[in-house]
C-alpha cells in the first residue's frame, strides 16, 4: 500500500497543486475502500473500471453519514488519475505516429482505426469488458473478436467497409497484465486475433506505403516481478536514511535538536527527566553508528563519553552473542547474507569508516535497530555513573522546609538509587514517617491504614495542613493567646502600684529589693570597692553577685533578698517577668531546636519547640510539655523557681543541651551549650543566660 500511496500522492501533487491531499488522507481512503470491498488490493485503483463504483459508493456514504472527507479526497485523486491517463494516451499516440512504437494505443490494423480510449464505451456484455476480470484472476489470455470498426476508411487500403487487410499479418496474442500499470490493460486486445507470433517477438517495421503493422513494445511481466519482490520483503529504511530515486541516501540529524539537547544536558544534567525524554525522542528511530557516536560526543564530556563507549561496546557484544546463537536474528538479516559482527555494528567495516552513505547502504535494518537500542541503554548507565544521586537515608525535613519540598528531594533521591522499583514506594513511606518534622510524623501515624502509596500520604498530609496548619505563625498565635491572661495580670499589678509624677510605674530595685525606685536611684547603692557591699544572691556582706561563691548553685533563685522569706506574695512584682508587650505580642516567640549531646540512648536527639524570649528571666526554663520524657534530668540544690503564683518545682538537665534559635528566613543562630531548667510552666522561656550567650536582643527580632 505504501508504494500505491506514494504514486497517487506524486500524481496529486503534479495535477492538483496546493489542493493535493496528504499521504495520510490517501491511506485512510484506500483502507476504507478495501474495508468496503470496493478494492481487492490498493493497486486496483489504477483500473478505470473501478472508478465509477467507488464514486457512487462514497457519494452514498457521504449522504448517509454526513462525512465528506473521503469523498473529497477521492475527487482529487480521481482528477489526478484521469489527467495522468489522458496525458499518457496522448504520449503513446504521439509515439505511434512518429514511428517510435510502444505505448497503450495500438497501431491501426489493416481493417480500421479504433476510436481513442477516452471515447470508447465498454458494455458489460462485450468481451472487451472481461479484461478486468481476466486481469484480477490472472487467467490465460484468450482470442478476442475483431474490434468494432468505425465509419472511416482503412489506413492501408482506404476501403470504408469490408476491409480484408486483417489477414495480412498475424498479431501476437493479447497481454493480460496485472493492475500495477493500467496503461497496459488492453494491450493485445486491440491487435486482433490469430497468428502464432510469440509474445514479445520483434516485428518488422512497416515501410510507408506498404501493408503491415508497426513493431509492438517488448513487454515485461511486471506482476511476476512484483510477486518476487514482495516475497523477499520490502526494504526497511530508518531515519535519517531516506529513499530517493537513486536508492537509500543518508540525511544528517537536525542541528537545532542536537543544540537544544546539549543545552539541556548542561543546565539540567544527565539524570534529569527532561534530558532523558529528549534523548529518547531523538533516538526513537534507528540511527547510523556515525550519527550515534557524533551525538554522544556533542552532549557528553570527555570522561562520560569514554564511559559510554565502553558501555556501548558491552551492549553490542550482547547483540552479537544473541545473533551468533540464532541465525535468523534480525541483526543477521533473517538468515540472508553474512552474520553481523562488531565492526559492522560500530561502522568500522570496509566501506563504512567515516562514510555515512556507505553505512546506510550496507547496514541491515535489524542492525540499525540493535545499534540504536544499545546506544540508548549505554547512555542510561552512564547517567547513573556520572551523576550519582544523593543517599536517600540522609535526607531529613528541615526546620523551615515545607513537606512538599522535602517529599520532592526524597522521591528524587530514591528513584535515582539502585533500589528495585518494587521497594521504592515502601522506602519513601517509611522515610516520611521517620525523617519528617514531629508534627508531620504525628499526622502520618494517625493516618488510616488504607494509605499505601506515597501520593496518598502526601495528599493526606496536605489536606490535614489545610484544616489545621502547623506553622510557626500558628504556634506563636496559640502561645500568645495562652499567656495573654498572665500578661494582663502583670500589667494590672504594675498599674495599681504607680507612683510619682506622670503616673510612671516604679519597679523593684535590684539592689535592695524595695519597690518605688530603680537600682540607679537606690539610696543603699554601694560602690564596688566598699567592703560593706551586700551580695544580691546570698544577701551576704562584703562581696557582690559576681564574686559570690554560691552563684552556680543559686541559679534560678531571685537575686537579692528573700532566700529565707518563702514564696513571694502575689501582689509583688515577680522576678521572672514576661517581656511580651501588647503592641508586639508575637515578636518574642521564636522557634528553637534542642539537641541532646549526652551519651545516654534516647529516641530523638533533636526536638523543635517554640519558646518565649524573656529578658527579665535569669535562666532558661524548658516546659515539661516540650521536654522529651526519655531525656534524663536531675534534682538541684534549690528545687524551686520563684515567680508568679509562688515557687515552682524545678529540675535540671543531666546532659548538656545544644540550643539553636531559628530565624524567620530559616537560618540558625550560633548554637549555645547549657544545662536548662525543666519545670511545669505554661511555655518554655529563654532567659538572660541564653540571650547573652546568643547575643540576641528583643529589638533585633
UniProtKB/Swiss-Prot annotation:
GO molecular function: aspartic-type endopeptidase activity; nucleic acid binding; structural constituent of virion; zinc ion binding
Motif Nuclear/nucleolar localization signal per record, residues: 524-527
Region (Involved in capsid protein dimerization), start-end ranges: 217-259, 290-298, 351-362
Protein EC: 3.4.23.-
The keyword NADP belongs to this UniProt entry's keyword annotation: no
Recorded superkingdom: Viruses
GO terms under cellular component: host cell nucleolus; host cell nucleoplasm; viral capsid
Residues in CCHC-type zinc fingers: 507-524, 533-550
Motif Nuclear export signal: chain residues: 219-229
Signal peptide range in chain numbering: none
Annotated site (Involved in capsid protein dimerization upon acidification): 418, 430
Compositionally biased spans, kind Basic and acidic residues: 128-141
GO biological process, any: proteolysis
Position of sequence motif LYPX(n)L motif: 180-184
Site (Cleavage): 155-156, 166-167, 177-178, 239-240, 476-477, 479-480, 488-489, 577-578
Active site (catalytic residues): 614
Motif mapping: PPXY motif: 172-175
Pfam families in UniProt: Gag_p24 (PF00607), Retro_M (PF02813), RVP (PF00077), zf-CCHC (PF00098)
All residue ranges annotated as the Peptidase A2 domain in the record: 609-690
InterPro entries: Aspartic_peptidase_AS, Gag_M, Matrix_HIV/RSV_N, Peptidase_A2_cat, Peptidase_aspartic_dom_sf, Primate_lentivir_Gag_pol-like, Retropepsin-like_cat_dom, Retropepsins
Domain notes per entry: Capsid protein p27: Proton-driven dimerization of the C-terminus facilitates capsid assembly.
Name used for this protein in its record: Gag polyprotein
Gene: gag
Amino acid at each position: 500500500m505504501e508504494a500505491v500511496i506514494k504514486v497517487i500522492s506524486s500524481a496529486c501533487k503534479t495535477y492538483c497543486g496546493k489542493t493535493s491531499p496528504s499521504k495520510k488522507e490517501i491511506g485512510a481512503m484506500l483502507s476504507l475502500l478495501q474495508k468496503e470491498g470496493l478494492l481487492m488490493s490498493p493497486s486496483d485503483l489504477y483500473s478505470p473500471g473501478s472508478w465509477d463504483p467507488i464514486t457512487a459508493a462514497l457519494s452514498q456514504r457521504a449522504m448517509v453519514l454526513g462525512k465528506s472527507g473521503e469523498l473529497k479526497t477521492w475527487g482529487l485523486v480521481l482528477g489526478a488519475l484521469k489527467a495522468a491517463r489522458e496525458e499518457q494516451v496522448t504520449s503513446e499516440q504521439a509515439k505511434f505516429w512518429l514511428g517510435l512504437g510502444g505505448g497503450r494505443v495500438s497501431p491501426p490494423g489493416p481493417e480500421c482505426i479504433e476510436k481513442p480510449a477516452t471515447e470508447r464505451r465498454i458494455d458489460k456484455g462485450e468481451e472487451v469488458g472481461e479484461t478486468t476480470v481476466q486481469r484480477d484472476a490472472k487467467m490465460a489470455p484468450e482470442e478476442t473478436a475483431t474490434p468494432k470498426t468505425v465509419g472511416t476508411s482503412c489506413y492501408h487500403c482506404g476501403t470504408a467497409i469490408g476491409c480484408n487487410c486483417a489477414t495480412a499479418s498475424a498479431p501476437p496474442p493479447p497481454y493480460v497484465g496485472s493492475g500495477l500499470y493500467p496503461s497496459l490493460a488492453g494491450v493485445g486486445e486491440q491487435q486482433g486475433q490469430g497468428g502464432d507470433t510469440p509474445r514479445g517477438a520483434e516485428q518488422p517495421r512497416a515501410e510507408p506505403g506498404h501493408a503491415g503493422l508497426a513493431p509492438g513494445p517488448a513487454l515485461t511481466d511486471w506482476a511476476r516481478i512484483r510477486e518476487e519482490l514482495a516475497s523477499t520483503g520490502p526494504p526497511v529504511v530508518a531515519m535519517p536514511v531516506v529513499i530517493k530515486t537513486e536508492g537509500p541516501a543518508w540525511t544528517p540529524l537536525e542541528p537545532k535538536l542536537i543544540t537544544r539537547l546539549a543545552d539541556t544536558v548542561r543546565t539540567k544534567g544527565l539524570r534529569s527527566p527532561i534530558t532523558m525524554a529528549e534523548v529518547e525522542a531523538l533516538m526513537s528511530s534507528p540511527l547510523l553508528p556515525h550519527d550515534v557516536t557524533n551525538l554522544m560526543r556533542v552532549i557528553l564530556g570527555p570522561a562520560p563519553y569514554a564511559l559510554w563507549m565502553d558501555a556501548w561496546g558491552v551492549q553490542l557484544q550482547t547483540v552479537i552473542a544473541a545473533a551468533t546463537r540464532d541465525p535468523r536474528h534480525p541483526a543477521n538479516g533473517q538468515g540472508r547474507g553474512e552474520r553481523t559482527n562488531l565492526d559492522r555494528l560500530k561502522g568500522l567495516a570496509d566501506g563504512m569508516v567515516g562514510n555515512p552513505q556507505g553505512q546506510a547502504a550496507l547496514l541491515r535494518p535489524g542492525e540499525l535497530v540493535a545499534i540504536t537500542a544499545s546506544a540508548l541503554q549505554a547512555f542510561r548507565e552512564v547517567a547513573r555513573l556520572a551523576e550519582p544521586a544523593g543517599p536517600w537515608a540522609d535526607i531529613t525535613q528541615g526546620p523551615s522546609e515545607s513537606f512538599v519540598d522535602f517529599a520532592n528531594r526524597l522521591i528524587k533521591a530514591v528513584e535515582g538509587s539502585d533500589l528495585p522499583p518494587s521497594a521504592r514506594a515502601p522506602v519513601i513511606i517509611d522515610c516520611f514517617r521517620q525523617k519528617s518534622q514531629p508534627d508531620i510524623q504525628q499526622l502520618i501515624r494517625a493516618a488510616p491504614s488504607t494509605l499505601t502509596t506515597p501520593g496518598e500520604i502526601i495528599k493526606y498530609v496536605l489536606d490535614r495542613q489545610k484544616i489545621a496548619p502547623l506553622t510557626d505563625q500558628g504556634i506563636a498565635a496559640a502561645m500568645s493567646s495562652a499567656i495573654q491572661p498572665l500578661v494582663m495580670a502583670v500589667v494590672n499589678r504594675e498599674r495599681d502600684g504607680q507612683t510619682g509624677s506622670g503616673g510612671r510605674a516604679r519597679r523593684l530595685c535590684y539592689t535592695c529589693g524595695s519597690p518605688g525606685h530603680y537600682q540607679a536611684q537606690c539610696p543603699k547603692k554601694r560602690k564596688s570597692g566598699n567592703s560593706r557591699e551586700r551580695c544580691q544572691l546570698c544577701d551576704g556582706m562584703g562581696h557582690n553577685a559576681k564574686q559570690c561563691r554560691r552563684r552556680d548553685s543559686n541559679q534560678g533563685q531571685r537575686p537579692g533578698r528573700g532566700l529565707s522569706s518563702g514564696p513571694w506574695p502575689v501582689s509583688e512584682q515577680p522576678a521572672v517577668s514576661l517581656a511580651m508587650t501588647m503592641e508586639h505580642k508575637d515578636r518574642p516567640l521564636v522557634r528553637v531546636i534542642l539537641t541532646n549531646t549526652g551519651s545516654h540512648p534516647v529516641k530523638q536527639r533533636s526536638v523543635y519547640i517554640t519558646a518565649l524570649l524573656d529578658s527579665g528571666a535569669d535562666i532558661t526554663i524548658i516546659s515539661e510539655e516540650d521536654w522529651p520524657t526519655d531525656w534524663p534530668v536531675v534534682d538541684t540544690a534549690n528545687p524551686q523557681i520563684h515567680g508568679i503564683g509562688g515557687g515552682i518545682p524545678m529540675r535540671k538537665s543531666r546532659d548538656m543541651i545544644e540550643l539553636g534559635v531559628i530565624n524567620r528566613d530559616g537560618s540558625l543562630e550560633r548554637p549555645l551549650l547549657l544545662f536548662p531548667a525543666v519545670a511545669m510552666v505554661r511555655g518554655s522561656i529563654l532567659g538572660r543566660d541564653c540571650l547573652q550567650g546568643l547575643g540576641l536582643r528583643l529589638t533585633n527580632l
